[in-house]
């Protein structure tokens, strides 16, 4: 029973942030425009990151949409630890490393792709 409680507590949206977002807009139309701009920005970042992963031949799970891209690794612990040495913080999940594309700019996404590529080359995975 802990999982639903934890998910509702820690994985839910920030009500204060949503209230601030809603209150900063003068109209519903303005808010809709901002939401659309943010969707496009997220799609642009994700497309860029996935193009780097494809170019570097870094495996990742199928991506449709969302805030995260998950890289495929049977044992993600060494990858996460390697990235942390450069202050790159990802999420360790079952057979993968989750990258929060939503919070990163292109320069940071390039850095992550290069570090993962370096990890693969060093470890000969």
Predicted ranges, named:
Residues 1-125:
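PLP-dependent class I/II
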């Amino acid at each position: 029973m802990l999982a639903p409680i934890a998910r509702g507590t820690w994985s839910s949206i920030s009500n204060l942030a949503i209230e601030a977002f809603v209150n900063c807009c003068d109209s519903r139309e303005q808010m809709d425009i901002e939401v659309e701009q943010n969707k496009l920005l997220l799609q642009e970042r994700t497309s860029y990151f996935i193009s780097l992963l494809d170019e570097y031949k870094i495996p990742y799970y199928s991506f449709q949409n969302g805030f995260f891209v998950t890289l495929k690794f049977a044992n993600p612990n060494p990858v996460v630890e390697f990235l942390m040495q450069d202050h790159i913080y990802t999420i360790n999940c079952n057979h993968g490393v989750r990258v929060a594309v939503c919070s990163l700019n292109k320069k940071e996404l390039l850095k992550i792709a290069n570090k993962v590529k370096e990890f693969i080359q060093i470890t000969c995975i």
